[in-house]
């Protein structure tokens, strides 16, 4: 059972923390409100796949939250050497015996929460730091991910 979902920087979600009801959850909302994106993020964290392909094959600039990219570009063009945008999806799981292999305290909860869970992080490859720095000098709204 998932006890908490945290999504940072993925598509529509700049920062989302959701604690599902242990019995029943209905996801409703207007078109383009993030219902499918929420389910996609959960599946991505659980399997590392999206649309039947690995995350690395499917990664594209539209995965990154546009507000975070805009803020990053604004800060960089102002001369502030801010960190590159990242995507982080965390699934906190019920503390049960069969899930203890997934137990750890490497999550963003403060104070530290030692519990079973799964996380996925998408961040720039340091091997391409020169290319990314060059892009940042004249940045476009889409983060290069090729």
Q: Where are the language model's segments positioned?
A:
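Glycine-rich phosphate-binding loops of NTPases
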Residues: 60-86, 92-146
């Amino acid at each position: 059972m998932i006890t908490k979902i945290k999504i940072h920087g993925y598509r529509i979600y700049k920062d989302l923390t959701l604690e599902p009801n242990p019995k029943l959850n209905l996801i409703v909302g207007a078109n383009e409100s993030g219902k499918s994106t929420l389910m996609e993020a959960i599946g991505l964290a659980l399997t590392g796949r999206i649309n039947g392909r690995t995350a690395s094959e499917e990664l594209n600039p539209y995965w990154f939250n546009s507000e975070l990219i805009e803020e990053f570009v604004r800060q960089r063009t102002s001369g502030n050497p801010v960190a590159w945008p990242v995507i982080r999806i965390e699934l906190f799981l019920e503390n049960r015996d069969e899930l203890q292999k997934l137990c750890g305290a490497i999550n963003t909860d403060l104070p530290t929460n030692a519990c079973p869970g799964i996380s996925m992080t998408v961040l720039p490859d340091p091997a391409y730091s020169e290319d990314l720095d060059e892009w940042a000098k004249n940045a476009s709204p889409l983060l290069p991910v090729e």
